[in-house]
Amino acid sequence: QDLEDEGHLPVRIYASFDEFPNLPFRTGLGNEKVRYGYYKIYVDGSLGGRGAYFSEPYNDAPEICGAMIHTPEEIEELVRRANNMGLQIGVHCIGDKAIDCVVSAIEKAYAENPRPDARFRLIHVLGINKELIERCKKLPVMFDIQPKFLSSDVHWAEDRLGPERSSYGFAWKKLIYAGFVETGSSDCHEEPYN
């Protein structure tokens, strides 16, 4: 904000945050250059580190399914609280089991408080499948995908997930044809921003 006030900010910033604010707050506060965006929740780990949480083990590590950062109950509470505060929500969820937990939490929170301005951003979603896509169609969900993953992850994703699961991992066209809004991001600092 100081750089913007001094006229030295050449870009627009839409900042996410991962802690609840202690003051009255809502998504969209700010100005043309610096605006508060969504409340971000991390649900599982990365595909590369085999931390993304899947319902079935990794193809190349049959003893591992990944891990959740929060319990399903904690995810439900975080999503419910953020939705009731009027915040947009962004959720890092890669594996199908993680996405399932998030979609279940959104279904409950949105049924409880169907705000007209609600927007739930699912980030990465490499483990999405047809059933999850159908459930998402009934919700104000959008997808935040990372085109850079096509050059960094696509070469080993099939070995990690197997052909069936990896067929949806980069199937962004399927999401567009299903009627979803997609945004692209760099996933910087994990990937270069250019």
Pin down the residues of each PLM region:
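Short acidic/histidine-rich active-site segments
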Residues: 47-50, 87-97, 145-147, 175-194
